[in-house]
Amino acid sequence: MSKTVITSTGNDLNAKFDKRFGRAAWFCVFNSETNGTTFYENQNINANQGAGTKAAEKMVELKVSRIISGDFGPKAKELLDKFNIQMIIIQDDNATVQTIINRMKN
């Protein structure tokens, strides 16, 4: 099973892509086998420090294989590398969760 996380500003497919990994409001988990999505609220969005690391720990817990975001901090990168979670960086300010899913399918 392949699960991809897309960082998002909201909890639906029309929400804008959020380029901030640790400070993204939501994480959309897309399951490529079922074409299903599940949204998880980022509980650490307002953490004074360590938001990226805590987000990375959540990704490990969710057993995702890759993450699409705009920026990963050094500590988050280190943890994601340790668990072989692929990090894909895109810088598209106009993308929605749905447009990114559509790109993955093509």
Model-based region annotation:
Residues 52-54:
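N-terminal active-site wall of soluble small-molecule enzyme domains
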Residues 1-50, 81-106:
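Non-catalytic interface/targeting segments
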Residues 56-88:
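Mid-chain, well-packed structural core segment of small domains
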